[in-house]
Every structure is written in C-alpha cells, then in structure tokens.
C-alpha cells in the first residue's frame, strides 16, 4: 500500500488553540477546536497513518538543557488547567482515530524527527504538522512540513526566503546566529547577515571552524566562541536515532464509524 504518514506536533497545535480562546480557558472547548482542526487536516492530507506526538510532563528538561543550561529558559509554562486536562484532549483525539505518543523523557521534536525520517527514508510520504521551523532541516522530496495556522508549506523556497540557506544548512546557520527565542546563543556578534555570508563562503559550520582563511572581521569572534557555536548547532539539530517502541501498523488511520 502507498503510505502517507501524518505526524502532529501535538502541543504546538493544542497550546495555540488554547491561547486563542476568548474568555475563560476551557479544556473541553480546546479539545473540540483541536478536533475540528484535525478533521480538516485529515480531509486535506488523506493519511494512511497518523499520530499525535506529545512532550513528556516531567521535570527533566532534557539533554539540550545539559548542553546549554539556559535553553528555553523563561518560556511560559503550560497553563495548569491545560496540563490537568491533557487526558481529555488525548481521548478526543482517539475518538477521531488518532493515537497519542508521549516522548518519555525525550523532546517531542526528536521523536517526531526520528519517526518522520524513518518512514521518509523508505521513499514513503510524510507530512509534519507544526509551526516549528526546526523541522525544516529534515525536508526532502518525501518529507514536508505544514503550518496549519498560516495554511502554508514550510518548504525549501520558504527556508531560502526566510533564512537564505538550504534546509540542511539550518543547524549550521543557527550554530552561528543562534535562536534568541530558545536561548540558543550561537556566536555573539554573528547575526543572521554574517551567518548567511559565512555559509555562502563555506558549506557548513565545521568547515568554518577549521578554515584558515577566515575573513579577519570574524576570526576573533569565531575562535573565541567556538564551543558555543558547536553546542548551539548540536542543540538546534534534531535527533533522528531514537528507539521507537512501536511499528507503523500501530498508527494506521482508521476513520471512526459515525
């Protein structure tokens, strides 16, 4: 059979829907609106397999915070009523025929990336539903990223327009320029413009760090902050080698009987 796997970045969807509610937040209403969105996604994408991937709810901030202690520091925590109602939302997803997968200590991003790449590398179609541009580093002819809220594809032309680099260069770009919203520092004094210029001269961060002919204006900064650049690139890179404790058959999409 032809496979089309749709992977939902669950909290990316849920938190945006919940925050957009007028008046007092209501988890049941959040679940209802999310299910309306998912029904549209299913109709639009016609998946053969589908799964919603959730972050774990533990206190462990994960391997990225061990490399960069300030990683994602200061972000608003999940509203308590939303965290308490997560089971209600997951049950509503299941009623639509969408199983939920919890990351169990790994960031959901890495679990999404591992699953998506495993299927896409077998020349089967994968669509990730998320506004997170970090997934764009995975783009390939068989792997797409869809921003549901903006109704647009985060594809190669989007990446080139937004950043000026190829999708596979994004971790190198972020290793240089950083990501301020995630407290990923990159190299102080190297902003988007300089990062783009460097990646037009050299193919990746490793080559930049080893180059003996670096333009003088950047030499000192890059030499001084080499470790920050390497850690930033690693944190911005998605892991794609996690162990998956299930197979595709477990997430096959079966439309619920009306």
UniProtKB/Swiss-Prot annotation:
EC number(s) from the headed UniProt entry: 3.1.-.-
Cofactor-binding details, from the entry: Binds 2 Mg(2+) per subunit. Only one magnesium ion has a direct interaction with the protein, the other interactions are indirect.
GO terms of biological process kind: DNA replication, Okazaki fragment processing
SUPFAM superfamilies assigned to the protein according to its UniProt record, in alphabetical order: 5' to 3' exonuclease, C-terminal subdomain, PIN domain-like
Domain 5'-3' exonuclease per the UniProt entry, residue ranges: 165-254
Enzyme class: hydrolase
Residues binding Mg(2+), per UniProt: 109
Cofactor entry: Mg(2+); K(+)
Alphabetically ordered keywords of this record: DNA-binding, Endonuclease, Hydrolase, Magnesium, Metal-binding, Nuclease, Potassium
HAMAP family: Xni
Protein's job: Has flap endonuclease activity. During DNA replication, flap endonucleases cleave the 5'-overhanging flap structure that is generated by displacement synthesis when DNA polymerase encounters the 5'-end of a downstream Okazaki fragment.
Protein name per Swiss-Prot or TrEMBL: Flap endonuclease Xni
């Amino acid at each position: 059979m032809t496979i089309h796997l749709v992977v939902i970045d669950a909290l990316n969807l849920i938190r945006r829907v919940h925050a957009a509610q007028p008046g007092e937040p209501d988890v049941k209403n959040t679940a209802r609106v999310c299910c309306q969105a998912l029904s549209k996604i299913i109709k639009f994408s016609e998946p053969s397999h589908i799964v919603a991937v959730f972050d774990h709810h533990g206190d462990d901030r994960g391997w990225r915070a061990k490399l960069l202690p300030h990683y994602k520091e200061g972000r608003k925590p999940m509203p308590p009523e939303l965290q308490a109602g997560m089971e209600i939302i997951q049950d509503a997803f299941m009623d639509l025929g969408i199983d939920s997968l919890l990351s169990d200590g790994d960031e959901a991003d890495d679990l999404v990336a591992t699953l998506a790449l495993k299927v896409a590398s077998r020349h089967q179609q994968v669509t990730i539903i998320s506004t997170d541009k970090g997934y764009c580093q995975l783009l390939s002819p068989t792997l797409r990223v869809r921003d549901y809220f903006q109704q647009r594809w985060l594809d190669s032309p989007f990446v080139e327009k937004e950043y000026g680099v190829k999708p596979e260069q994004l971790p190198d770009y972020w290793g240089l320029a950083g990501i301020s919203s995630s407290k990923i520092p990159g190299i102080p004094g190297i902003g988007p413009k300089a990062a783009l210029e460097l990646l037009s001269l050299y193919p990746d961060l490793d080559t930049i760090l080893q180059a003996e002919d670096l333009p003088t204006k950047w030499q000192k900064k890059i030499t001084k902050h080499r470790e920050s650049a390497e850690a930033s690139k690693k944190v911005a890179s998605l892991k794609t080698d996690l162990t998956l404790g299930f197979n595709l058959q477990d997430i096959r999409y079966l439309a619920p009987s009306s």
